[in-house]
């Protein structure tokens, strides 16, 4: 996870990266290590949740939860890791308690996390616009994050709608994955049925390499007086 986070964070360090830290990958010591490693990787923010290590997607049913005490221990470990590392990583406290334990328990967990030093609250599985507005109001002035998952248990909100309800951060975890999955499925189906692969404008090897930094590599080599690309690419 640290390696992947570091690779993404350093594609463009000027763009802040929010990373999923799941459960912290273990007890308080592992949470401490996870947060420390994410800080060293250049991650700008992470979210930490209250499911057990054998967790499931927040938009599936019958999720299990750890106790509030264990959850807050994770948050405390994350805050301590940030202090010890002299980092400024933003800590997002997530709870999945809404579905099984109800609204009041979920809010209690988030308020406890905020008291310990969490910077942002994340109530997974908000069930309606009314509930969304309610949680944003209940946790003021702490920023609240909305998880935009089309077809999930939460309402489909535009950026403007989410802002109007009081959310201050929105994540779109399936945006790229769903687009890529659909495109790959279509391409493989065409190959299987016709024996040919899709050919689209702007899909040459050079175009792909440009997306992943070919021109930046050329510029860096040229600036250093290198000759790797002097005859072109």
Predicted regions and their residues:
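Alpha/beta enzyme core
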Residues: 1-175, 182, 189, 223-233
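Extended, intrinsically disordered, low-complexity segments
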Residues: 177-233
